[in-house]
Regions:
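Conserved GNAT-family N-acetyltransferase fold
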Residues: 60, 71-73, 88, 93, ...
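Conserved acetyl-CoA-binding loop-helix of GNAT-fold acetyltransferases
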Residues: 90, 95, 101-114, 126
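Conserved glycine-rich acetyl-CoA-binding loop
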Residues: 68, 96-107, 119, 135-136
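Conserved active-site alpha-helix within GNAT-family acetyltransferase domains
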Residues: 118-122, 127-151
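A short beta-loop-alpha structural element at the N-terminal edge
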Residues: 12-25
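A conserved beta-turn-beta hairpin within the catalytic core of GNAT-like acetyltransferases
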Residues: 78-90, 100
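Active-site rim helix/loop that mediates acceptor-substrate recognition in acyltransferases
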Residues: 26, 33-65, 69-79
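C-terminal "cap" of GNAT-fold acetyltransferases
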Residues: 125, 146-177
């Protein structure tokens, strides 16, 4: 069995999604979210729909030294007050169940945020656990909202310029089939 060594030793290789990775990403995402009580099981479909719409600004994979795909993260454009800009949404992020809580997701997130900075992105938003995402600098702000969701879970990270204000909307792929 191929595994990623524990934190502190060899890290996964993070690189852009390659042609032909879509099926593996879909299978990985389905497996990663299957045991999650908050999941509606739609995450793989969202990634496929973003890819088909040309809306995957960044699609990164984590690979073991042997080349096994064990993680994926997607970033796509978001709109603030229905205006396009340089803000992006993080997610979904998926890690093979046997490798969760071993730093693969953190490596994907950190690399993805660095790549957004390279693209001169203004910021990034997500809907997720504030206790987890705080380590990457994500914060909640009542001036930035998402479809009436609890503000505690809708978070942002400013990469340049002032914080965004208004109501954020993700790509329509997140709205369902």
């Amino acid at each position: 069995m191929n595994t990623i060594p524990p934190q502190g030793s060899e890290s996964p290789r993070i690189e852009p999604e390659r042609p032909g990775d879509a099926r593996e990403i879909s299978q990985l995402t389905t497996a990663a979210f299957a045991p999650m009580p908050f999941s509606d099981g739609d995450e793989a479909r969202v990634i496929d729909a973003l890819r088909e719409a040309g809306a995957l600004t960044l699609s990164l994979v984590a690979l073991t030294a042997e080349g096994e795909l064990v993680g994926h993260i997607a970033f796509s454009p978001v709109r603030i007050d229905d205006q396009p800009g340089d803000w992006y949404g993080l997610g979904p992020v998926s890690v093979a169940p046997r490798l969760q809580r071993q730093g693969v997701g953190s490596a994907l997130i950190a690399t993805g945020l660095d790549r957004l900075r390279d693209l001169s992105a203004a910021g990034c938003v997500l809907l997720g656990n504030p206790d987890y995402y705080r380590r990457f600098g994500f914060l909640s702000d009542p001036a930035l909202t998402y479809q009436g969701r609890p503000n505690r879970y809708f978070q942002h990270l400013v990469l340049k310029g002032p914080p965004a204000q208004g109501d954020a909307s993700f790509h329509p792929a997140f709205d369902g089939p």
